[in-house]
């Protein structure tokens, strides 16, 4: 078997001739493997045999070649589960390699979340920052600056807004090129099940703002529990009964709360700092699979201790739309 590190690029490599055995014959086989941070995607097993027509074929898929796709949700240095973070901690180890930084054309920073080698999720509100309400996706895309990993600038090809973005605060960003995956840049997995049950702990990362409302240059993260939805609705809307609702948001901005959202909040003893950026993932660790999933995307940030809850769009609510959009673009 030739398991050479780099697949031989149409250049003949002289291998020693295998010894002949009595009543036997030699069959030429190769096995495809992927570089670190990528995994083999194929219905076969990656092993190909040279047939009589001198074509490499696999038992299950014939001549169709496998692909190497990015591994998701497996950070090399996952955040320390034991640490209880209330004030927000600096991410020195690259525990959130899916976190991207988005800068609008008038220099407002927000977050975005890498979900494969070429696509990111963010909020529709982020995409409209500094644009008129009737701006088109084609006008927005060229105005964005996007950074992944250690401040690596990546070029945006297009923006796709959720068809119902006034209710579902979500948009997708496609990059011009696939971004190479390594320990600093890795997508988070998208969940097919709902991880947002009350009390579940998730991690939110972002550049946030310090108490002077200045953006910080260091990625920070905070650990938060999923909150009771009714309490959150009462906090922002005064009542869970539609007729009795009156917007009473303590911060003057009304978050979008509906069946596509969940809330997460902290104890009241938080420091005078805002964490997380809209567009960042509510990342949960599935311990059975040892995999990190984006349960939600931060839509409305708690505004520095005044409001108790952050509001997130449920990723399973938009999963079908995300998959269709990526497949069609």
From Swiss-Prot:
Keyword Repeat among UniProt keywords: no
The keyword Disulfide bond is annotated on this UniProt entry: yes
Sushi domain mapped to chain residues: 13-70
Family: Belongs to the peptidase S1 family.
Disulfide bond residue pairs: 34-68, 72-189, 232-263, 274-304
CDD domains reported in the protein's UniProt record: CCP, Tryp_SPc
Keywords: Acute phase, Antibiotic, Antimicrobial, Antioxidant, Disulfide bond, Glycoprotein, Hemoglobin-binding, Immunity, Secreted, Serine protease homolog, Sushi
Name of the protein described by the UniProt record: Haptoglobin
Pfam families registered for this protein in UniProt: Trypsin
Quaternary structure and interacting proteins, as annotated: Tetramer of two alpha and two beta chains; disulfide-linked. The hemoglobin/haptoglobin complex is composed of a haptoglobin dimer bound to two hemoglobin alpha-beta dimers. Interacts with CD163. Interacts with ERGIC3.
Region: Interaction with CD163, residue numbers: 241-246
Propeptide: 84
Sequence intervals crossing the membrane: none
Glycosylation sites: 9, 107, 214
Function: As a result of hemolysis, hemoglobin is found to accumulate in the kidney and is secreted in the urine. Haptoglobin captures, and combines with free plasma hemoglobin to allow hepatic recycling of heme iron and to prevent kidney damage. Haptoglobin also acts as an antioxidant, has antibacterial activity and plays a role in modulating many aspects of the acute phase response. Hemoglobin/haptoglobin complexes are rapidly cleared by the macrophage CD163 scavenger receptor expressed on the surface of liver Kupfer cells through an endocytic lysosomal degradation pathway.
A GO BP annotation: defense response to bacterium
SUPFAM superfamilies: Complement control module/SCR domain (SSF57535), Trypsin-like serine proteases (SSF50494)
Entry GO terms, CC: blood microparticle; extracellular space
Domain Peptidase S1 intervals: 85-327
An MF annotation (GO) of this entry: antioxidant activity
Lineage: Eukaryota, Metazoa, Chordata, Craniata, Vertebrata
Species, as recorded: Canis lupus familiaris (Dog)
Tissue: Expressed by the liver and secreted in plasma.
Localization, UniProt: Secreted, Extracellular space
Domain notes: The beta chain mediates most of the interactions with both subunits of hemoglobin, while the alpha chain forms the homodimeric interface.
């Amino acid at each position: 078997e030739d398991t050479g590190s780099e697949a031989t690029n149409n250049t003949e490599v002289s291998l020693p001739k295998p010894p002949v055995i009595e009543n036997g014959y030699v069959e030429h086989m190769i096995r495809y493997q992927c570089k670190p941070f990528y995994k083999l995607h194929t219905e076969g097993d990656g092993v190909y045999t040279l047939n009589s027509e001198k074509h490499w074929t696999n038992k299950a898929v014939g001549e169709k070649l496998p692909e190497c796709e990015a591994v998701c949700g497996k950070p090399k240095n996952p955040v320390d589960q034991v640490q209880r973070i209330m004030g927000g901690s600096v991410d020195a180890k690259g525990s959130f390699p899916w976190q991207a930084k988005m800068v609008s054309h008038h220099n407002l920073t927000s977050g975005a979340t890498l979900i494969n080698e070429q696509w990111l999720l963010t909020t529709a509100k982020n995409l409209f920052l500094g644009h008129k309400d009737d701006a088109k996706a084609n006008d927005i895309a060229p105005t964005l600056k996007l950074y992944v990993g250690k401040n690596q600038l990546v070029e945006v090809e297009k923006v796709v807004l959720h068809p119902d973005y006034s209710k579902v605060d979500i948009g997708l960003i496609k990059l011009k090129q696939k971004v190479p995956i390594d320990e600093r840049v890795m997508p988070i997995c998208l969940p097919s099940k709902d991880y947002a049950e009350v009390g579940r702990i998730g991690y939110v990362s972002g550049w946030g703002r310090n108490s002077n409302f200045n953006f910080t240059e260091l990625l920070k993260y905070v650990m938060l529990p999923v909150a009771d939805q009714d309490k959150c609705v009462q906090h922002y809307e005064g009542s869970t009964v539609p007729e009795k609702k009156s917007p009473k948001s303590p911060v003057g901005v009304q978050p979008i709360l509906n069946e596509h959202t969940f809330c997460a909040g902290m104890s009241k003893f938080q420091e005078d700092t805002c964490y997380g950026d809209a567009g960042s993932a509510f990342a949960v660790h599935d311990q059975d699979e040892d995999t990190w999933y984006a349960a939600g995307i931060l839509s409305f940030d708690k505004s520095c201790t005044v409001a108790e809850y952050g509001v997130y769009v449920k990723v399973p609510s938009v999963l079908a739309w995300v998959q269709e959009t990526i497949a069609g673009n």
